[in-house]
């Protein structure tokens, strides 16, 4: 189950942080590390700071885009320390651990951490189902990347241990939720349809698509429900083409 939980680092700029993150992960039983467009490649410093977790570094998936790292996941949680102009469903670290373990029984889960200095962009955060914030000391809330990973990884492990200690058998059944890939295709289809009907203007969608993303993220439609929505969009497109042909 824990292998289904991906720790995703976006544009990490210091190899030492990669090593420290690998160490934080392995102490909690996590080994699935993804590096998105790292500004530097793992090197001897990363191996040194991994302190026995060099296998996590050696087996890390290095990809060019966040979409590649999220492919195949049904749940994505992004870390965010800043308040956003567009509110998003929030979790605390404990809730994040519980939800991640519950969903990782069936499909991959991604826990996404941003750049050392500026974190994740708004666009990247909008690809997440939830945001998680660590309730650090407001007078000094500066956690480095490995510290943040350690906090979240600890809560994941505690949630996983609870299922083991209670003797709970996790049912491995097909998740009813769509994968991130399916959701992104839906958002693309939705934007295309809204453009075709004139509801939004090309190059000037305003906040409409952002707010619609938030709406569907909050509602979190199941796979069958998403298929219904895609069918509605296809019907609107067909009707719109018919009107133009007349």
UniProtKB/Swiss-Prot annotation:
Consequence of substituting residue 175 to A: No change in activity
Effect of substituting residue 177 to A: No change in activity
EC number: 2.1.1.200
Binding residues annotated for S-adenosyl-L-methionine, in chain numbering: 79-81, 114, 134, 141-143
Cellular localization per UniProt: Cytoplasm
Phenotypic consequence of residue 140 to F: Strong decrease in activity
Keyword Secreted: no
tRNA processing found in the keyword field: yes
Domain of life according to the entry: Bacteria
Catalytic activity: cytidine(32) in tRNA + S-adenosyl-L-methionine = 2'-O-methylcytidine(32) in tRNA + S-adenosyl-L-homocysteine + H(+); uridine(32) in tRNA + S-adenosyl-L-methionine = 2'-O-methyluridine(32) in tRNA + S-adenosyl-L-homocysteine + H(+)
Outcome of substituting residue 231 to A: Loss of activity
GO cellular component, one term: cytosol
GO biological processes: tRNA nucleoside ribose methylation
Molecular function terms, GO-annotated: protein homodimerization activity; RNA binding; tRNA (cytidine(32)/uridine(32)-2'-O)-methyltransferase activity
InterPro entries according to UniProt: Alpha/beta_knot_MTases, RNA_MeTrfase_TrmJ/LasT, SpoU_MeTrfase, tRNA_m1G_MTases_N
Protein name from the UniProt record: tRNA (cytidine/uridine-2'-O-)-methyltransferase TrmJ
Originating organism: Escherichia coli (strain K12)
């Amino acid at each position: 189950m824990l292998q289904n939980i991906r720790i995703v680092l976006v544009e990490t700029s210091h190899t030492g942080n990669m090593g420290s993150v690998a160490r934080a992960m392995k102490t909690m039983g996590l080994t699935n590390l993804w590096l998105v467009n790292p500004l530097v490649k793992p090197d001897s410093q990363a191996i040194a700071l991994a302190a026995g977790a060099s296998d996590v570094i050696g087996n890390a998936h290095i990809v060019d885009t966040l979409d590649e790292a999220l492919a195949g996941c049904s749940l994505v949680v992004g870390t965010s320390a800043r308040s956003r102009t567009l509110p998003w469903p929030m979790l605390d670290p404990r809730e994040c651990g519980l939800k991640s373990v519950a969903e990782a029984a069936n499909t991959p889960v991604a826990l996404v951490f941003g750049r050392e200095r500026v974190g994740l962009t708004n666009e990247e955060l909008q690809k997440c189902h939830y945001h998680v914030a660590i309730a650090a000391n407001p007078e000094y809330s500066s956690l480095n990347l490995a510290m943040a990973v350690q906090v979240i990884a600890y809560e994941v492990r505690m949630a996983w241990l609870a299922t083991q200690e209670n003797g709970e058998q996790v049912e491995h059944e097909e998740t009813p939720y769509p994968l991130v890939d399916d959701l992104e295709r839906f958002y693309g289809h939705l934007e295309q349809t809204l453009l075709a009907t004139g509801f939004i203007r090309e190059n000037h969608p305003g906040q409409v698509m952002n707010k619609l993303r938030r709406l569907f993220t909050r509602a979190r439609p199941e796979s069958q429900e998403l298929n219904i929505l895609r069918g509605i969009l296809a019907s609107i497109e067909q009707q719109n083409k018919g009107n133009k042909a007349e």
